[in-house]
Every structure is written in C-alpha cells, then in structure tokens.
Regions:
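Mature, well-folded catalytic/scaffold domains that follow N-terminal targeting or propeptide regions
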Residues: 1-267
Length: 267
C-alpha cells in the first residue's frame, strides 16, 4: 500500500503479465525475476519529505462526508500534501469519479507544461522538470485503472498516489496554453499516424522511444474509457502537444551545476 519506486512497480506488474501472455510461459521466469528484483530493491517514496503525508492520508481516506469528487480547479497549485489531503477528504466519492478527477488534473498539468522550465539550469536534483515527469503521471494513471478495477481494495492507494503526481507537477504551467489549441479532431486517424511514427521514431535513446511508446498506448487506453469524461480529451490534447514538441535530453550546464552543488554539500 505504500508509494513504491515512483509508481514504476505498479506500471510494471500488468505489463509483465501482458508480456508473458504474448510471448508465452517460457519467458515467465526471467520476466518475473526482474519484476521481483525491482520491487524488492525499489525505494519507498512515501518515506521522503515530499510525500511523507501519504500514510496519514491513506489512513484517513474516505472518512470525510463529501461524497463528490473535487473539481479540476480545486487542485490548482496544491502541493503533494494538500493534493493528497483533498483527495482523502473526498474519498467517499465513487472511485471511478475520483479517478476521472485526478486523471484530469494530471493531464492538465502535462498539457500546460511551461516549456521554459526545460531551460532551468540552477535547480537542485529532483526539482527540475521535463516532459517525462508529466507523461509518467498518465502512464501511472493507466496502470492504476488496470489494477484497481481488478482489485478494488487498492483504489485508495492508487488514487492517493495519483494525487502525489498531481501535486508534484503543480506550479509548472503556462497560462497561455489552452485546451482548444491542442484538441484532436480525429482521434482514430491520430492514433494510426502516431503508431506508424513510433515504428520509425528516429530517437537515439531507448528511454525516449520507450516513453513515447508507453505514453501513446496509455493515452489510447484512457481515451477509450467512457467513464473518465472530459479527462480523456485533456489527456489526448496533452499527448498531442508532447508529440509536437522537442524532447530535450542533454542538459550539460544543468548537470554540471547540480554536480557542483551536490559536492559542495559535503565540503
């Protein structure tokens, strides 16, 4: 029930099952060994200061009387602690409705990401932001839906961890970015063209090509969920903007300054 490995553990579990299903039982031992090793050695993010309120929020989840999900605007500017507290207060709302609300928040954060933050060079480790920080919120949301609809008892943990992502990525928005500019008029054609592009992506780093692939597939599944309502449109628009923007990977000055700052802490 804790926040494990920045959400990667939850993402890997259904994907490992899918991989074994497609490739056959013969690949099960190495795939499962890798999965178990990653779970055993993964970090508990609920123990770091940024997410330290997770345990309390999980304990108090659903004890409030508010049975309606908070609006998208209610999450605006909330840090992880406040985003989790708001989610827990509304924990008696139907899980699917609360999920749609949190998906909309994470999708909105990604859609409105201020690209000027890609040029930040004086930020300490962990505080700089890039596209992968935001796309991870959607791929994690996809995994939450996959597992929590199968194991409903996991909804509180999954929803609160979505709130962690929402709060962590708050405050990096560009107010000039609006939904209408990035809405996709023909989703079916859009996904067909993007899938074809992914087969000839031209990316030199596997981490970029793989993240693009899993984000496209996650948004495709999320868009097909009728119960998430307008959140699906926001997620699709966010993906459209991501694919229309460059994914800068080399941050030489940022890396150098972060390294010097890190070393100075020990001198």
């Amino acid at each position: 029930a804790h926040y494990h490995s920045f959400g990667h553990a939850l993402i890997y579990i259904p994907k490992a099952a899918e991989l074994i299903h497609y490739l056959g039982e013969g690949v099960a031992p190495p795939v499962l060994l890798c999965l178990v090793r990653s779970i055993v050695t993964g970090f508990r993010e609920d123990l770091i200061p940024e997410f330290s309120h997770y345990g309390d929020a999980l304990s108090g989840f659903g004890q409030g009387q508010n049975g309606r999900p908070p609006s998208l605007e209610a999450f605006a500017g909330l840090n992880p602690a406040k985003a989790m507290a708001l989610t827990a207060e509304h924990g008696s709302a139907p899980p699917a409705e609360l999920y749609a609300s949190l998906l909309a928040v994470n999708a909105q954060n990604m859609l409105t990401f201020d690209l000027r933050h890609l040029q930040d060079i004086d930020q300490p480790y962990g505080s700089d932001r890039g596209w992968l920080d935001f796309s991870h919120g959607l791929t994690f949301a996809d995994a939450v839906y996959s597992l929590c609809t199968r194991y409903p008892e996991l909804w509180p943990a999954g929803l609160l961890q979505m709130a962690c992502f929402a709060g962590r990525n708050a405050g990096y928005d560009d107010s000039d970015v609006i939904l209408e500019d990035w809405m996709v008029s023909d989703p079916q054609t859009f996904f067909q063209e993007i899938t074809a592009m992914l087969m000839d992506h031209g990316q030199s780093e596997y981490i970029v090509s793989v993240h693009l692939l899993k984000t496209v597939q996650a948004v495709k599944r999320l868009y097909a969920l009728p119960q998430v309502g307008a959140a699906s449109q926001i997620a699709l628009a966010a993906l459209n903007r991501l694919l229309s923007s460059s994914v800068r990977r080399k941050m030489v000055r940022r890396t150098a300054r972060q390294a010097m700052h890190f070393i100075r802490q020990d001198t």
